[in-house]
């Protein structure tokens, strides 16, 4: 059962759930908390590798990822990031989220943005128990026009679901947690699997 708005506020008030900066009550609706777009992005460099063999030797996968991913792009205030049709880009939420060991989170895109062709997450919308950091967004423009994305705009909504008990291996305690404490648009670390 997902938390309702009153429960989300109570979990924020008692410190079990952390969202920084804390959203105003107007952004906590029904069963979700609206989140905004941060100012950090990564893109894919065009045709710098013929392919990436995801099951190949780790060193080769790592080298291929280094060739295809841009350095982090940090937008100055007021600037827009343009996502063209058919392009994939990574970004982060403005908010940093901290989940306790007995709560899982879910990120959903906004319907208004989806109706323009913007996918906010390609597949990875679960936020593990014990997570701490900003949430990476996997943008894809499936529409016909470029989309101007500006830091601070509403970009998605988080919902939260209590677990039957605390997780035995929460994200923040795992040695193999590849994205622990991420604050920027961290590229894929599939080579660490």
UniProtKB/Swiss-Prot annotation:
- Residues of the region (Disordered) are 169-193
The EC number of this protein is 3.5.4.13
> In the record, what terms sit under GO molecular function?
dCTP deaminase activity; nucleotide binding
Q: What positions does the entry give for dCTP binding?
A: 110-115, 128, 136-138, 171, 178, 182
Q: Name one GO biological process term.
A: nucleobase-containing small molecule interconversion
Q: Does the keyword Hydrolase apply?
A: yes
Q: Which organism is it from?
A: Erwinia tasmaniensis (strain DSM 17950 / CFBP 7177 / CIP 109463 / NCPPB 4357 / Et1/99)
Indicate the enzyme's highest-level EC class.
Answer: hydrolase
Q: What is this protein called?
A: dCTP deaminase
PANTHER family (UniProt xref): DCTP DEAMINASE
- What does it do? Catalyzes the deamination of dCTP to dUTP.
Which Gene3D superfamilies does its entry note? Answer: 2.70.40.10
Reaction catalysed?
dCTP + H2O + H(+) = dUTP + NH4(+)
Query: Keyword set for this entry?
Result: Hydrolase, Nucleotide metabolism, Nucleotide-binding
Quaternary structure, from the entry: Homotrimer.
Name of encoding gene: dcd
Give the positions the UniProt entry annotates as the active site.
Answer: 138
Q: Which family does it belong to?
A: Belongs to the dCTP deaminase family.
Q: Spell out the InterPro entries in the cross-references.
A: dCTP_deaminase, dUTPase-like_sf, dUTPase_trimeric
> What pathway does the annotation place this protein in?
Pyrimidine metabolism; dUMP biosynthesis; dUMP from dCTP (dUTP route): step 1/2
Q: Which HAMAP family match?
A: dCTP_deaminase
């Amino acid at each position: 059962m997902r938390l309702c708005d009153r429960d989300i506020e109570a979990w924020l008030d008692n410190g079990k759930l952390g969202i920084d900066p804390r959203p105003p009550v107007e952004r906590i609706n029904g069963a979700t908390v609206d989140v905004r777009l941060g100012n950090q992005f990564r893109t894919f460099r065009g045709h710098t590798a013929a392919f990436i063999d995801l099951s190949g030797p780790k060193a080769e996968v790592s080298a291929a990822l280094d060739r295809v991913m841009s350095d982090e792009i940090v937008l100055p205030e007021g600037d827009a990031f343009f996502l063209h049709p058919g392009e994939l880009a990574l970004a982060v939420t403005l908010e940093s989220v901290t989940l306790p060991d007995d709560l899982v989170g879910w990120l959903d895109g906004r319907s208004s943005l989806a109706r323009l062709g913007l996918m906010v997450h390609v597949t990875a919308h679960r936020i593990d128990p014990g997570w701490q950091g900003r949430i990476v967004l996997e943008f894809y423009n499936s529409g016909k026009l470029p989309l101007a994305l500006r830091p601070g705009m509403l970009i998605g909504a988080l919902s939260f679901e209590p677990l039957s008990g605390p997780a035995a291996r929460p994200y923040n305690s795992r040695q193999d947690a590849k994205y622990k404490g991420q604050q920027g648009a961290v590229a894929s670390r599939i080579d660490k699997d």
